[in-house]
C-alpha cells in the first residue's frame, strides 16, 4: 500500500504496520527527493533514513499538520532538531498518519483547533451571525504546546498567543484546489473554539482561564466608539471574547500610505491577523469556549452558501496557531554550496530531504529573526498563494539537509611537561641562589637546550626537606586549639 521506505531494509516494514509508514519526501513542486520510514511514537514523529541518523520532531514542537489525498505534511517549530520548516511526505496512507497523529495529540492533552466559528465585528459576544459549524475531522489539525496551568492533562485546553499569521495562509503541502482549506468571510473575523473532551474538562474550564497575552488589558472602557483600536476582553457565561488591535506592521503601512491619520494609542503587543486596507473595517478576532455539544456536531461543514459569506469562496481563513515556548534560532540549515559535497559523499543526493516551502526567505525578509514567524511573510509581499515558488526564494537552499552525523573525534591536544633537572644538583652546587627573586644563572650556560624548552625548575632537595619538615610536625589529636600563631613550632 505505502510508497515509502525503511531505514535499514525497505521490505522490513509491512504495508499495514500500525505505527510505521513508508513515505517519500517531496519538495514544493512535487519532485521526489528521498524515501524513509515515518514512525509515530507516544511523544514524537521519527523519520528513519537510510544510512543516516533518525530525525525526530516532538509533538509539542509541531505547529500544524494535515493531509490531502496521498500527501501528509506538517510545520515544525524552531525548537525542533531541524529548526523551523514545513515538510511534505507522499504516502498512500496519509490519512492514517493524520488520524493516528491526531489521536496521539489528544491523548497527550495537546490542543488541536478544529472548529472555526465565525463572529462578525459588530456582533454581540452572545449573538452569532453564522451557525457554529465545526470543521470535519479530516480537515487540518493545529497543535499548540500550551496548557492553562502549565501541566498537560489539567485544566481546559486553551490556546496561548504565539505570532501573527496571514489571511492567505493555508496548508503548505496542499495544492490550490485543496478541499481542506478553510474559507473566511469578507470581514476576516475569526473565532477559535476550544472544545473540552468531556464534561469534567468543561467544568474545570469555568474556573480556569488562560492568561491574557502581554499587552492586552482586560475590561477596557468602551467609550471610544465603534472605531476603537485597543484590545478588549469580554467575559460571558460559557465564552470569552478577545478583541485585538492592529498589528505594528499594519499601523506602519497605514501611516506610510496616509490611509489612517491617527490611531488611538495602539498596543505594542498584539496577535491579531492581517488588517484590511481600510481603517474603519478593522477586523476583530473572537475566541470562544464552547461546550462539548459542538464537538458532537463535527459533521457540519462551512459552505460558501451560508449567509454572510457573499460568495467569496476563494478567501482563505487566517489560521492563528499559537505556542508559548520562547523562539530559538533555526539550526541544521544547509547551504546550497554544501549540497554538492554531500552528494559526492553519499552517492545519492536525493537522500537529503527538503521541507515543502520551509521558508527561510533570507533575501526577502527585512525583519529580525525573533520577529519572523514563518515563511508566509514572503507570500504576502508577492501576493501569491502558499507555498512560495523556489524561483522567488533566491537566498534559501533548495534542499534541506537531514544528514545529522555524529561529531568526529577531537584532534589530539598538546601536552606540556615540566622538565626536572636530576643532574648537576649535587653538593658542589653553590648555595647562593636561595633568594627566589634572583635568577639561577648557571642553568642557561650549562644546559642551554633544556632551559629553552622548559618553563619551570624544581628544586628536589628543597622539596624533600620541606616534606620531611611537615612529617616531623606533631600530630593533632583534636584536643589542641590550633591557630596560625601557635602551630609553627619546629621539631628540635
Swiss-Prot record:
The keyword Hydrolase does not apply. Residues 13-115 form the IRS-type PTB domain. Phosphorylated by ULK2 in vitro. Phosphorylated on tyrosine residues upon stimulation by BFGF or NGFB. GO terms for biological process: fibroblast growth factor receptor signaling pathway; signal transduction. It comes from the Eukaryota. CDD domains: PTB_FRS2. Keywords: Lipoprotein, Membrane, Myristate, Phosphoprotein. GO terms for cellular component: cytoplasm; plasma membrane. Transmembrane segments: none annotated. InterPro entries: Docking_Protein_DOK (IPR050996), FRS2_PTB (IPR038742), IRS_PTB (IPR002404), PH-like_dom_sf (IPR011993). Its main location: membrane. It is found in: Membrane. It is a lipid-anchor. Adapter protein that links FGF and NGF receptors to downstream signaling pathways. Involved in the activation of MAP kinases. Down-regulates ERK2 signaling by interfering with the phosphorylation and nuclear translocation of ERK2. Binds NTRK1. Binds FGFR1, NGFR, GRB2, PTPN11 and ERK2. This is Fibroblast growth factor receptor substrate 3.
Amino acid at each position: 500500500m505505502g510508497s515509502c521506505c525503511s531505514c535499514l531494509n525497505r521490505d522490513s516494514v509491512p504495508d499495514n504496520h500500525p505505527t510505521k509508514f513508508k513515505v517519500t519526501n517531496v519538495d514544493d513542486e512535487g519532485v521526489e527527493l528521498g524515501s524513509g520510514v515515518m514512525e509515530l511514537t507516544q511523544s514524537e514523529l521519527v523519520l528513519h533514513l537510510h544510512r543516516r541518523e533518525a530525525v525526530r520532531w516532538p509533538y509539542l514542537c509541531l505547529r500544524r499538520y494535515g493531509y490531502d489525498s496521498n500527501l501528509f505534511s506538517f510545520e515544525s517549530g524552531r525548537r525542533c532538531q531541524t529548526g523551523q520548516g514545513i515538510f511534505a511526505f507522499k504516502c498512500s496512507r496519509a490519512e492514517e498518519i493524520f488520524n493516528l497523529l491526531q489521536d496521539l495529540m489528544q491523548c497527550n492533552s495537546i490542543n488541536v483547533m478544529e472548529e472555526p466559528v465565525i463572529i462578525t465585528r459588530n456582533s454581540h459576544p452572545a449573538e452569532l451571525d453564522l451557525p457554529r459549524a465545526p470543521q470535519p475531522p479530516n480537515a487540518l489539525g493545529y497543535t499548540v504546546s500550551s496548557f492553562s496551568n502549565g501541566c498537560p492533562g489539567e485544566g481546559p485546553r486553551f490556546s496561548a498567543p504565539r505570532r501573527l499569521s496571514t489571511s492567505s495562509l493555508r496548508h503548505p503541502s496542499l495544492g490550490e484546489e485543496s478541499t481542506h482549506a478553510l474559507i473566511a468571510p469578507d470581514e476576516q473575523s475569526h473565532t477559535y473554539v476550544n472544545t473540552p473532551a468531556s464534561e469534567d474538562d468543561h467544568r474545570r474550564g469555568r474556573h480556569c482561564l488562560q492568561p491574557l497575552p502581554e499587552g492586552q488589558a482586560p475590561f477596557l472602557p468602551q467609550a471610544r466608539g465603534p472605531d476603537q483600536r485597543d484590545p478588549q476582553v469580554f467575559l460571558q457565561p460559557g465564552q470569552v471574547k478577545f478583541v485585538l488591535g492592529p498589528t505594528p506592521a499594519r499601523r506602519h503601512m497605514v501611516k506610510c500610505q496616509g490611509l489612517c491619520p491617527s490611531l488611538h494609542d495602539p498596543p505594542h503587543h498584539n496577535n491579531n491577523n492581517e488588517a484590511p486596507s481600510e481603517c474603519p473595517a478593522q477586523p476583530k478576532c473572537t475566541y470562544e469556549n464552547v461546550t462539548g455539544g459542538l464537538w458532537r456536531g463535527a459533521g457540519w461543514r462551512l459552505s460558501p452558501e451560508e449567509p454572510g459569506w457573499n460568495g467569496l469562496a476563494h478567501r482563505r481563513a487566517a489560521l492563528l496557531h499559537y505556542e508559548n515556548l520562547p523562539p530559538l534560532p533555526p539550526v541544521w540549515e544547509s547551504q546550497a554550496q554544501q549540497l554538492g559535497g554531500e552528494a559526492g559523499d553519499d552517492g545519492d543526493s536525493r537522500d537529503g530531504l527538503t521541507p515543502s516551502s520551509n521558508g527561510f526567505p533570507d533575501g526577502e525578509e527585512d525583519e529580525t529573526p525573533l520577529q519572523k514567524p514563518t515563511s508566509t511573510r514572503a507570500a504576502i509581499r508577492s501576493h501569491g498563494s502558499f507555498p512560495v515558488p523556489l524561483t522567488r526564494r533566491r537566498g534559501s537552499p533548495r534542499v534541506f539537509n537531514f544528514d545529522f552525523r555524529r561529531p568526529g573525534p577531537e584532534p589530539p591536544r598538546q601536552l606540556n611537561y615540566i622538565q626536572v633537572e636530576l643532574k648537576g644538583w649535587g653538593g658542589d652546587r653553590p648555595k647562593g641562589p636561595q633568594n627566589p627573586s634572583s635568577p639561577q644563572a648557571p642553568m642557561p650556560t650549562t644546559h642551554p637546550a633544556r632551559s629553552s624548552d622548559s618553563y619551570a625548575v624544581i628544586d628536589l632537595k628543597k622539596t624533600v626537606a620541606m616534606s620531611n619538615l611537615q612529617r616531623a610536625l606533631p600530630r593533632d589529636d583534636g584536643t589542641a586549639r590550633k591557630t596560625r600563631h601557635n602551630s609553627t613550632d619546629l621539631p628540635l
